Amino acid sequence: MNKLENKVALVTSATRGIGLASAIKLAQNGAIVYMGVRRLEATQEICDKYKEEGLILKPVFFDAYNIDIYKEMIDTIIKNEGKIDILVNNFGTGRPEKDLDLVNGDEDTFFELFNYNVGSVYRLSKLIIPHMIENKGGSIVNISSVGGSIPDISRIGYGVSKSGVNNITKQIAIQYAKYGIRCNAVLPGLIATDAAMNSMPDEFRKSFLSHVPLNRIGNPEDIANSVLFFVPSEDSSYITGSILEVSGGYNLGTPQYAEFVGSKVVE
């Protein structure tokens, strides 16, 4: 028996990258997975492809920028399945061209990022938790970022918003543990998604990797495996409010780490 058999999951922003990898991973373990997306036709093609492998993936319309859509999406899933056992809040956005340091960054962009990155977690969790209470339990996994725990010289809005995701994870965990609901967060480092690879020059990636002890860029499967760990109750039944960095050790080294390794003192 698959560990997630008869479980119903929702993964937001699931057409590619971390969201798609997480949706597939949950489906491979027996879950009925709804993929919250804007591109229904393209996602249906993905679902049809994996249906041949016996996976149950279903597209459902989700636009994180349209607040009215949130309830419609949840109502659709509840109508179809009667419950939601698992929520993976994968949606997240950035505005690097306007989200700079405190003085030079755009103020409207700062609050926009907070509204969508934290607000999407808040709104979806607020809608789904009552159903989880009725179902006597559930698991929420929020996809945050190492940027939420490590300050940057730029992107203040993104960092603060992801820090907010980390905090709301703990708030949900402590407030709803008595109902059998667990909430944890996964904090990716540099992950080889199309969005990341297309926006980062080689020089930056090389510099970033010099601060990663495991000396490789992560892949969406690394994050999906962490999501899977947090979801089934038998694997992580005593874990809630956890903030797990999946970054190859990026937050372990001192600022001198790259220079230290480069000097070949460590071989």
From Swiss-Prot:
PROSITE patterns in alphabetical order: ADH_SHORT
Pfam families: adh_short_C2
Binding site for NADP(+): 13-18, 38, 63-64, 90, 158, 162, 191-195
Keywords: Bile acid catabolism, Lipid degradation, Lipid metabolism, NADP, Oxidoreductase, Steroid metabolism
Enzyme Commission no: 1.1.1.-
Residues noted as binding cholate in the record, renumbered to the chain: 145, 158
Broadest EC class assigned to this enzyme: oxidoreductase
Annotated site residue numbers, Lowers pKa of active site Tyr: 162
SUBUNIT field: Homotetramer.
Chain's role: 7alpha-hydroxysteroid dehydrogenase that catalyzes the NADP(+)-dependent oxidation of the 7alpha-hydroxy group of 7alpha-hydroxysteroids, such as the major human bile acids cholate and chenodeoxycholate, to the corresponding 7-oxosteroids. Is thus liley involved in the metabolism of primary bile acids.
Protein family: Belongs to the short-chain dehydrogenases/reductases (SDR) family.
The protein, known as: 7alpha-hydroxysteroid dehydrogenase
Protein species of origin: Paraclostridium sordellii
